[in-house]
A protein has these predicted regions:
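Thiol-/selenol-based redox modules, centered on thioredoxin-like
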Residues: 166-200
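Structural microenvironment flanking redox-active thiols in thiol-disulfide oxidoreductases
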Residues: 100-137
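Short active-site neighborhood of thiol/selenol oxidoreductases, capturing the structured segment around
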Residues: 72-110
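Short, internal strand/loop/helix patches
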Residues: 134-167
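N-terminal "domain-start" segment that seeds a small globular fold
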Residues: 32-79
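Structural beta-sheet core signal
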Residues: 89, 120-122, 166
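Short acidic, S/G/P-rich loop/turn micro-motifs used as interaction or catalytic elements
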Residues: 93-99, 126-128, 180-182
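Hydrophobic membrane-insertion alpha-helices, especially the h-region
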Residues: 5-25
């Protein structure tokens, strides 16, 4: 085989390899684009779901329900509330572990922004022993109050997620928010908004 034929074969091999590589790269980019678009659609659905929940429960008024502190002292929800609004965080041992980790982690990060005496943490679980063990696992440097009975029954039961809301002595739900771990910037925006609205 002459030198020219060797060169021609080599060039054809290089072109074939380069063409295959470029096709694979284009296919990879197309797959990534489709994946990102899919993520974007999921995020939109999550945000719309959050907005619809906020609208559905806006101004919902809780009956005054009993709570218990870590020392076993019983009190009513209204005893923790004041005329000025407080941030209420409700969490359950039945919530998904990654949701708990994300939400509690974010709550810890805003303790230097929102006064601790303006935060009420309500913990729900099955039985006093489980409640105490679950509360201890959160490592929150805040007073925790256990639910006695089923105060939140029928309120975001199906969602089974931690949530926040603002409330006062009127016991009305305002600015309800369900953190979405897939969209952390949404949670950041919520806390920035309520900090500016209520605590600055």
């Amino acid at each position: 085989m002459s030198m020219y034929k060797w060169i021609l074969v080599a060039v054809l091999c290089i072109l074939t390899f380069a063409g295959g590589y470029m096709f694979a790269d284009v296919q990879k980019n197309a797959n990534l684009k489709a994946l990102y678009q899919g993520d974007s659609e999921i995020q939109k659905e999550l945000l719309l779901g959050n907005m619809s929940m906020t609208y559905a429960y806006s101004n919902y008024r809780f009956p005054d329900f009993p709570l218990m502190d870590r020392d076993g002292k019983e009190m009513f929800f209204s005893h923790l509330m004041e005329k000025e609004k407080k941030l209420v965080f409700r969490i359950s041992s039945n919530n998904c572990s990654s949701c708990i980790d994300f939400t509690v982690g974010y709550l810890k990060s805003i303790l230097n922004v929102i006064p601790r005496d303006k935060i009420v943490v309500i913990v729900e679980g099955n039985g006093k022993r489980e409640l105490k063990a679950f509360a201890d696992s959160l490592h929150l440097e805040l007073p925790l109050y256990y639910i006695v009975g089923y105060a939140f029954q029928g309120f975001l039961d199906k969602e089974n997620l931690p949530f926040f809301f603002m409330s006062s002595s009127e016991l009305k739900v305002e600015d309800l928010f369900i953190p979405i771990k897939e969209i952390p910037e949404h949670t950041e925006f919520y806390f920035r908004a309520i900090s500016k609205k209520y605590f600055l």
